[in-house]
From Swiss-Prot:
Subunit organization: Component of the Sec protein translocase complex. Heterotrimer consisting of SecY, SecE and SecG subunits. The heterotrimers can form oligomers, although 1 heterotrimer is thought to be able to translocate proteins. Interacts with the ribosome. Interacts with SecDF, and other proteins may be involved. Interacts with SecA.
Keyword Cell wall biogenesis/degradation assigned: no
Cell location: Cell membrane
Native species: Streptomyces coelicolor (strain ATCC BAA-471 / A3(2) / M145)
Organism superkingdom: Bacteria
HAMAP family referenced in this protein's UniProt entry, alphabetically: SecY (MF_01465)
Gene: secY
GO biological process: protein transport by the Sec complex; SRP-dependent cotranslational protein targeting to membrane, translocation
Name recorded for this polypeptide: Protein translocase subunit SecY
Pfam family, one: SecY
General function of this protein: The central subunit of the protein translocation channel SecYEG. Consists of two halves formed by TMs 1-5 and 6-10. These two domains form a lateral gate at the front which open onto the bilayer between TMs 2 and 7, and are clamped together by SecE at the back. The channel is closed by both a pore ring composed of hydrophobic SecY resides and a short helix (helix 2A) on the extracellular side of the membrane which forms a plug. The plug probably moves laterally to allow the channel to open. The ring and the pore may move independently.
One function term, GO molecular function aspect: protein transmembrane transporter activity
Length: 437
């Protein structure tokens, strides 16, 4: 692998892409520390110190922003508005015929959907920025902090508007940086920024576990967590690479004096076809009712029930509902992202067939059957990998922001593998050996 990295840097265009990507990452990390007007950062730091790693409701969003959310910086919202907008557009594509038609128009349609995603991202950034500022002003952002109500000293409307504008502009810059990486760098830009945001929280989270440990001054807990994390990474890599290959043959055809077809290939169906999307969907859904309770500041019976059973990640109802939501969204996302009828029609159009299966509708039914069977273990794996770390490592003072939690590991491994594969394909195009030998 080190040799492959060396070869990548020796290739001028690859070196340029890698250095460009690294430069954008540096700019992104610098942006997470740029303050916005109207915030007393001395009080913010005091509240962060008092939180002692227990960041409550905002932990997931804080992880995706690389810790910028609870610091209330320009990039406080991170890429979460863009992720949410992308998910909403994907869902709307299924139910709105106009968007579905755009998706089938190729590059022009994709560009139009991307434009809609940008508009929706800005709208969501304004909403989320307003919610964050309102929460910070009320003191609910750090509920256990003694100076939480003094984070935003100036309660004027103008100050609030300026803060929201700064956060929205920061989200637009993050979106632009991600698109720059996609166009001129290595890998998918938004995925790379998400990877960096999560990885940036690892050192402080690990050190917090060491400080909270009691055995051998915390080093036993620290080492155990590292070991468990490595085992989990290995497991996730194994499952993410696992796939069912459906053999496909193409009939030989004579057009003029030339022979076409007669080749064999396969359709790769991954065990985890949905990726990390079901986990993000489930987390977002469970986040909404708890957020409503926090904004309403209600003490009614329904609010108490939600706080006790849904907002608490260690509560049994939360764990059960979270697991079933992940399984449901795994099947749902696979259904909207992989169309067996479309695949079968394309195979039939170009003379392809699955050995032993008739072309057309029987092929689509066979693909649906295989996909359903392979999605079951994939969805159960997603649910377990998202829950087991929380339950098994509760004794180490871990919370929903634990660095080796299901969501973070799935994203880190998934993005890492895709980026390495892209570099590998670029190397192989230049007759070099890649990483995955």
């Amino acid at each position: 692998m080190l040799t492959a990295f060396a070869r990548a840097f020796k290739t001028p265009d690859l070196r340029k892409k890698l250095l460009f990507t690294l430069g954008i990452i540096v700019v992104y990390r610098l942006g997470t520390h740029i303050p916005i007007p109207g915030v007393d950062y001395k009080n913010v730091q005091e509240c962060v110190d008092q939180a002692s790693g227990n960041q409550g409701l905002f932990g997931l969003v804080n992880m995706f922003s690389g810790g910028a959310l609870l610091q209330i910086t320009v990039f406080a919202l991170g890429i979460m508005p863009y992720i949410t907008a992308s998910i909403i557009l994907q869902l709307l594509t299924v139910v709105i015929p106009r968007l579905e038609a755009l998706k089938k128009e190729g590059q022009a349609g994709t560009a139009k959907i991307t434009q809609y995603t940008r508009y929706l991202t800005v709208a969501l950034a304004i909403l989320q920025g307003t919610g964050l500022v309102a929460t910070a002003r009320s003191g609910a952002l750090f509920s256990g902090c003694t100076v939480a109500g003094q984070i935003v000293p100036d309660q004027a409307i103008f100050t609030t508007v300026v803060m929201v504008i700064c956060m929205t502009a920061g989200t637009c810059v993050v979106m632009w940086l991600g698109e720059l990486i996609t166009d001129r760098g290595i890998g998918n830009g938004m995925s790379i920024l998400m990877f960096i945001s999560i990885a940036a929280t690892f050192p402080s989270a690990l050190w917090a576990i060491k400080k909270q440990g009691e055995l051998a001054d915390g080093w036993i807990e620290f080492g155990t967590v590292i070991l468990v994390g490595l085992v989990m990474v290995g497991l996730v890599v194994f499952v993410e690479q696992a796939q069912r290959r459906i053999p496909v043959q193409y009939a030989k055809r004579m057009i003029g004096r030339r022979s076409y077809g007669g080749t064999s290939t396969y359709i790769p169906l991954k065990v985890n076809q949905a990726g990390v999307i079901p986990v993000i969907f489930a987390s977002s859904l469970l986040y909404i009712p708890a957020l409503i309770v926090q904004f309403s500041n209600s003490t009614a019976g329904w609010a108490t029930w939600i706080t006790k059973n849904l907002a608490d990640t260690a509560a049994t109802p939360h764990i059960i509902l979270y697991f079933f939501l992940i399984v449901f969204f795994a099947f749902f996302y696979v259904a909207i992202s992989f169309n067996p009828e479309e695949v079968a029609d394309n195979m039939k159009k170009y003379g392809g067939f699955i050995p032993g299966i008739r072309a057309g509708r029987p092929t689509a039914e066979y693909l649906s059957y295989v996909l359903n069977r392979i999605t079951w273990p994939g969805s159960l794996y997603l649910g377990l990998i998202a829950l087991v770390p929380t339950m098994a490592l509760a004794g180490f003072g871990a919370n929903q922001n634990f660095p080796f939690g299901g969501t973070s590991i799935l994203i880190i491994v998934g993005v890492g593998l895709e980026t390495v594969k892209q570099i590998e394909s670029q190397l192989q195009q230049r007759n070099y050996e890649g990483f995955l030998r």
